[in-house]
Amino acid sequence: MNEGINNRRKKKISLMEIFIPLFCLINQYEIAGLHLGLICVIAVVAIYFIKYREFYLYKPLFIFFLFMIVHDFFRMFITGFNTGLWVERVLYLLILSCIYKKVDEENLFRVWEIIGIIVMAGIFYQSFQVYILGQSVSTINIFPFLQSNSENYLLGYDRPHSFFLEPAAYCTWILPLLCMCMKRKKHIWMVFISISILLSTSSTGILMTGVIWLFYSFVSARSERKYFNSLMIVGVLIIGIGAFSNLSIFSTALNKLMNISVTNTSNSVRLVLGFQLFWATPLIYKVLGIPYMNVENYMRSGEVALSKYKLSLNLSYLGFVNAIGNCMLIYGVFGLLLYLKLFWNIWKESDLYSKCYVLTCIISIFGQSVFWNSLFVTQFAVMLCSVERTSFIRVTLGQGVTSNSYE
């Protein structure tokens, strides 16, 4: 009986469960030129290793990481080696290796829920300023005494984005909470989160929200035999889209979704530029990757006819491509296959409801730059929490000895 009572007790919230939802927020700021989030990663990893003296490497992620570092090692004879970038990536790998068996999904949901209330309050407050008062809004500064690592936090937007630098970043951050609410059938929470995403007018966020609701209706019909509920969800989505489409504040986002065209520079950069550049490269580049440090250097090299893509050297976003385009160009077709295999492994090893978030992450790599950055860490931290099978390598730190064993 006591054992049953203990099993029903809520586990104590760990440092890692607090850190995951906060990471994207704090990583927007700098201390002495260093990302605050990266400093916190070092601290969290150090505390974790001292306490547990072990970590779990997710095999598909580790294989992809090894491929990238070996690739960059050989490429450094042409382009040099970005030490700072790889220190950051090593730290990201380590923090993701602290997830398995140490992060309780229910605790993570509770923490995200509390932080989500505060962040959504910022969205609703800024929505009042933008849509009722007609004011422009800037990022709500969490640390007034620190500088952001982007100049965007000083800019005024006509779109609410709360504590984030842009609306798309807010939507990417809040989507895990929406999926966790779906898994727990917290419908009121789902509605409020969905409304906050609509208010941000992020086309990516609105698209992902629609995917999540459709996934939920499909699961309800297939697994729970709740066909009426599924029809209601689809009906509400159709009515909601029809109602919101008549509001001027959502016209821009809806037009971006309904009128996607490769001739539009914004759409082209986000969706197809990476693919266009990849197919235009020589065969050797397709196999081994471009012989440049990054995509921007490649586009400034003279090898790319920028006018063909309606681009110029003075653009601030020159070199921006989506995550899958970045992977293809830098690491070639073999890197791309390992990247996609990583998602496939997580998909296979996730439960039914967790697959929904994996699906949104897969879609995001076609429209967002989420390749080994803070959003990448947040996405994979959430996905690895729900991995059920045993694709992990246990690394135990002993007395000068590191022992590896398969779980």
Give the ranges of each region predicted by the language model:
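Long extracytoplasmic/lumenal interhelical loops at the membrane interface
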Residues: 260-331
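N-terminal signal-anchor transmembrane segment
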Residues: 1-52, 67-75, 363, 377-382
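Aromatic-anchored transmembrane helix interface
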Residues: 60-69, 78-102
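Alpha-helical transmembrane segments of multi-pass inner-membrane proteins
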Residues: 113-137, 152-157, 162-201, 206-218
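Transmembrane alpha-helices of multi-pass inner-membrane enzymes
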Residues: 42, 357-407
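Hydrophobic transmembrane alpha-helices and their immediate junctions
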Residues: 186, 213-218, 225-232, 324-362
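Loop-to-helix entry and N-terminal half of a specific, functionally important transmembrane alpha helix
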Residues: 12-22, 318, 345-372, 381-383
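A membrane-periplasm/extracellular boundary helix in multi-pass inner-membrane enzymes
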Residues: 125, 220-262
